Amino acid sequence: MNDSEFHQLADQLMLCIEETLDGFSGDSDIDYETNGGVMTLTFENGSKIVINRQEPLHQVWLATKAGGYHFDYREGHWYCSRSGEEFFTKLSEAATAQAGEVVSFS
């Protein structure tokens, strides 16, 4: 993958997250802000999830209350470099824990 392909895939990922949050109809208030390739989700309880691009590695990194995760793109999805877990599965799990209600990304 070259840098251009990486940016296109990372942009698609961020857009999908934005669209999910814009359409979220739960009780929790989840705000997001994107600045310089870094997306920060802020929850009512003050906790945050940070998603950022690591261009030199062609990875997307996810930082949650539970820990940090690095994701590589393969076979049409972003997968954790340690556990093999898919990005949206891990993000949904973390957002649900931090929001106190089900938040589902796909």
Curated annotation (Swiss-Prot):
The set of disulfide-linked cysteines is none
This protein's UniProt keywords: Iron, Metal-binding
GO CC, any one term: cytosol
* UniProt KW Cell wall biogenesis/degradation keyword: no
Output one GO MF annotation.
ferric iron binding
A GO BP term here is:
iron-sulfur cluster assembly
Judging by the UniProt lineage, the source's domain of life is Bacteria
Its function?
A: Involved in iron-sulfur (Fe-S) cluster assembly. May act as a regulator of Fe-S biogenesis.
Q: Which family does it belong to?
A: Belongs to the frataxin family.
Q: What is this protein called?
A: Iron-sulfur cluster assembly protein CyaY
Q: Which source organism does the UniProt entry give? A: Yersinia enterocolitica serotype O:8 / biotype 1B (strain NCTC 13174 / 8081)
